[in-house]
Amino acid sequence: MQDLIKAAMAARAKAHAPYSKFYVGAAMRDEHGQVHAGCNIENAAYPQGWCAECSAIAHLVMSGATRVTEVAVLGNGDVLCTPCGGCRQKIREFAAGDVKIHCCTEVGVLLKSFTLDELLPASFGPENLK
């Protein structure tokens, strides 16, 4: 888990959040054990920005991976920063319900871990479209 947290911290340092000043880093482990990180990228046209989890997923997909097996997320200060609803659904596309999502302080101290099912109960996923 420490490698995920370190990657999320490094990604957070690159976040582009000039409007909200809320800097987020996320890192995800894929099915091969590789770590993919992302940061939030705000835009003056607010809804057009990217969440950190979204940019980490993009990195994971571009590498050829198809599964998320573990996640770390950290935001500002000591505030619990969980993925937003949209990112929970995006993670769901690539992860099983028992995947752990570790929420940390900006300096990497673990605050709480959740399963994806805890954050997104009774979710809709790819199997619903078969």
Q: What is each of the regions a protein language model found here?
A:
Residues L4-A7, A11, F22, Q34, ...:
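Generic hydrophobic secondary-structure packing signal
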Residues K21-D30:
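Short beta-strand scaffold segments in enzyme catalytic cores
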Residues C39-C54:
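Compact, glycine-rich, soluble single-domain proteins
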Residues C51-V71:
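Short, solvent-exposed cationic patches
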Residues D30-H32, E106-V107:
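Short acidic-glycine loop/turn motifs at beta-strand connectors
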Residues H32-N43, R67-V71:
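Glycine/charged-rich beta-loop-alpha catalytic/anionic-binding loops adjacent to active sites
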Residues M1-A17, T66-K130:
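C-terminal binding/interaction regions
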